[in-house]
């Protein structure tokens, strides 16, 4: 079983506002809150990575991550915990996306401001295997792991 870490380095890119709309829809906001244990900042943090890296991260998320089922026109998504420049965040892989060379991240805070980055800055994304992050969730969220 994979324990990690996988490290992907990519370029922060400004989005088009699709993530903000998605996160602001009550159904998705509630589901994201259920998974991450906090109210998400209304928007996503987009990072351009190599397609192979994106596909590896997506495969990990769809194998071991949390599923948000489709609802309405936006479809579903897979979520998987990560660190971006050392800060906790969640990778989001929507079923419907135009960004084949990007990964989207969500957090309870505005990552762009928290990390003090601008369009074009390089960031590091780190992910671990499910046994590692499930243990971390139990230690920080209690025995239920935040569920």
Swiss-Prot record:
Pathway: Cofactor biosynthesis; FMN biosynthesis; FMN from riboflavin (CTP route): step 1/1
GO molecular function, one term: magnesium ion binding
Residue positions binding CDP: 15-20, 109-112
Binding site for FMN: 97, 104
Gene Ontology BP terms: FMN biosynthetic process; riboflavin biosynthetic process
InterPro entries on file: RibK_CTP-dep, Riboflavin_kinase_archaeal, Riboflavin_kinase_CTP-dep, Riboflavin_kinase_dom_sf
Keyword Cytoplasm among UniProt keywords: no
Positions with a binding annotation for Mg(2+): 44, 46
Domain of life of the native organism: Archaea
Catalysis performed (reactions): riboflavin + CTP = CDP + FMN + H(+)
The keyword Transferase is assigned to this record: yes
Entry cofactors: Mg(2+)
Swiss-Prot/TrEMBL keywords: Flavoprotein, FMN, Kinase, Magnesium, Metal-binding, Nucleotide-binding, Transferase
Cofactor note text: Binds 1 Mg(2+) ion per subunit.
Pfam families hit by this protein: CTP-dep_RFKase (PF01982)
Top-tier EC class: transferase
Entry EC no(s): 2.7.1.161
Database matches in Gene3D superfamilies: Riboflavin kinase-like
SUPFAM superfamilies cross-referenced by the UniProt entry: Riboflavin kinase-like (SSF82114)
Protein family: Belongs to the archaeal riboflavin kinase family.
Its job: Catalyzes the CTP-dependent phosphorylation of riboflavin (vitamin B2) to form flavin mononucleotide (FMN).
Protein name: Riboflavin kinase
Lineage: Archaea, Methanobacteriati, Methanobacteriota, Methanomada group, Methanopyri
The encoding gene: ribK
